[in-house]
C-alpha cells in the first residue's frame, strides 16, 4: 500500500526572482485579504506587491538572497524519508505561495492509496491551515485523485511538540541567569477583523503561551517576565497587539529572549524581522542581551515528532 505525507507551509522566495511571486500570491490569497471578488483582490494584490517589492527584495538580499524555509524544509523531508526508508511511506512538501505548489507535488502521487496532509502550523487560522488545506483540496479535485485523504490539524497542545520548544529555550539560556531575562513569544499578527469573524488564532496563541509558561515553571526555569507580542503588521487596519517593537522599546530589563511561537520552520519573518530588524531596535535601546531562539526546523527532535504524529494516523 503506497502512502504519502505532504507537509504544507506558506513558502518563501528561493531566490530574488521569486520575491514578487511570493508577495503576489500571498496578497491574492482570499484567506489573507478577505476579499471575495477575484478581480478586485487581484488588483489590490498587484498594488500591494508593487509597493512592497523593493523593500522586500532588499530584506531578502540581507538574508543572502533567499528565505531559509525552502532549504530547511527540503532537509526535513530528506531526514524523514531516511527515517522511514524501510517502510512504504514517502514524505514530500508543498507551499502556498512559491513552488512547489500543491498541484505540483500531488500530481506525483496521483495513484497513492493514502495521502496525509500535514500543515506545519501549530495554531488554527483561516490564513494558514485553512488556506493550505484549501489549496491542497483544490489540487486533489483538479487531479481527480481518489486516494484516502487524512489530515493532521493544529498541535499546539501536544506535549511532545512543546517539549521541543521548552528544550530549545532552556538550551539558549543555559549559561545565563534567566530570572534577569524577559521571555517574549513573538507571533505573526493578524487584522482584528479576521479574529472578530471567529478565527481561533488569537485564542490558540494565548493558550499556547500559557502552556509553555507552565511547562517552564514546572522545570524550574524562571524568567523576569513572560509575554506575548506580535510582528509583521501591514497597512492601516487594526491589528492584534501589542507590537513587538513597542514591547522592546518599553522593556526595562534590556534583556530579551525571543521565541517565534507561530512557526515550525524558520523563514524571513524569523531570520530577518526578529534576528535583524528587531535586533536593531534592541541595539538602539542599548540592550545587554537580545537573542532569538530557532524554530524546530529540521532538528532530530522535530523529525521524531513528525514521525510520531504520522504513525498515529497511518
From Swiss-Prot:
Give one GO biological process term: heme biosynthetic process
User: Cellular component GO terms, alphabetically?
Assistant: cytoplasm
Q: What is its EC number?
A: 4.98.1.1
- Domain of life from the UniProt record: Bacteria
Recite the UniProt keywords alphabetically. Answer: Cytoplasm, Heme biosynthesis, Iron, Lyase, Metal-binding, Porphyrin biosynthesis
* Catalyzed chemical reaction(s): heme b + 2 H(+) = protoporphyrin IX + Fe(2+)
What cystine linkages occur within this chain?
Answer: none
Q: In which compartments does the protein localize?
A: Cytoplasm
Annotated SUPFAM superfamilies? Chelatase (SSF53800)
Q: What class of enzyme is it?
A: lyase
UniProt GO molecular function: ferrochelatase activity; metal ion binding
* Pathway the protein acts in: Porphyrin-containing compound metabolism; protoheme biosynthesis; protoheme from protoporphyrin-IX: step 1/1
InterPro entries associated with the record: Ferrochelatase, Ferrochelatase_AS, Ferrochelatase_C, Ferrochelatase_N
Q: Which Gene3D superfamilies match?
A: 3.40.50.1400
PANTHER family per UniProt: FERROCHELATASE, FERROCHELATASE, MITOCHONDRIAL
> What exactly does this protein do?
Catalyzes the ferrous insertion into protoporphyrin IX.
- UniProt record similarity statement: Belongs to the ferrochelatase family.
How is this protein named in the record? Answer: Ferrochelatase
What organism is this sequence from? Campylobacter fetus subsp. fetus (strain 82-40)
Amino acid at each position: 500500500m503506497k502512502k504519502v505525507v505532504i507537509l504544507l507551509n506558506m513558502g518563501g522566495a528561493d531566490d530574488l526572482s521569486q520575491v514578487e511571486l511570493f508577495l503576489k500570491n500571498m496578497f491574492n490569497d482570499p484567506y489573507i485579504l478577505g476579499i471575495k471578488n477575484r478581480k478586485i483582490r487581484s488588483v489590490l494584490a498587484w498594488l500591494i506587491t508593487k509597493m512592497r517589492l523593493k523593500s522586500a527584495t532588499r530584506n531578502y538580499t540581507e538574508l543572502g538572497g533567499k528565505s531559509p524555509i525552502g532549504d530547511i524544509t527540503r532537509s526535513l523531508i530528506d531526514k524523514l524519508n531516511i527515517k522511514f526508508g524501510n517502510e512504504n511511506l514517502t514524505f514530500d512538501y508543498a507551499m502556498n505561495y512559491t513552488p512547489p505548489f500543491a498541484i505540483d507535488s500531488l500530481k506525483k502521487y496521483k495513484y497513492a492509496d493514502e495521502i496525509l496532509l500535514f500543515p506545519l502550523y501549530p495554531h488554527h487560522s483561516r490564513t494558514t491551515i485553512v488556506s493550505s488545506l484549501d489549496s491542497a483540496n483544490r489540487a486533489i479535485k483538479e487531479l481527480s485523485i481518489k486516494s484516502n485523504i487524512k489530515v493532521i490539524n493544529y498541535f499546539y497542545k501536544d506535549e511532545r511538540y512543546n517539549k521541543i520548544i521548552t528544550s530549545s529555550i532552556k538550551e539558549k539560556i543555559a549559561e545565563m541567569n534567566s530570572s534577569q531575562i524577559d521571555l517574549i513569544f513573538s507571533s505573526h499578527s493578524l487584522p482584528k477583523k479576521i479574529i472578530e469573524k471567529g478565527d481561533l488564532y488569537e485564542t490558540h496563541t494565548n493558550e499556547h503561551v500559557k502552556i509553555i509558561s507552565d511547562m517552564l515553571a514546572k522545570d524550574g526555569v524562571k524568567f523576569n517576565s513572560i509575554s506575548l507580542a506580535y510582528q509583521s503588521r501591514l497597512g492601516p487596519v487594526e491589528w492584534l497587539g501589542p507590537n513587538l517593537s513597542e514591547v522592546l522599546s518599553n522593556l526595562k530589563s534590556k534583556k530579551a529572549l525571543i521565541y517565534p511561537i507561530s512557526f515550525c520552520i524558520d523563514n524571513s519573518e524569523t531570520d530577518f524581522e526578529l534576528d535583524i530588524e528587531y535586533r536593531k531596535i534592541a541595539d538602539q535601546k542599548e540592550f545587554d542581551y537580545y537573542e532569538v531562539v530557532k524554530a524546530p526546523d529540521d532538528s532530530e527532535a522535530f523529525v521524531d515528532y513528525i514521525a510520531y504524529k504520522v504513525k498515529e494516523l497511518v
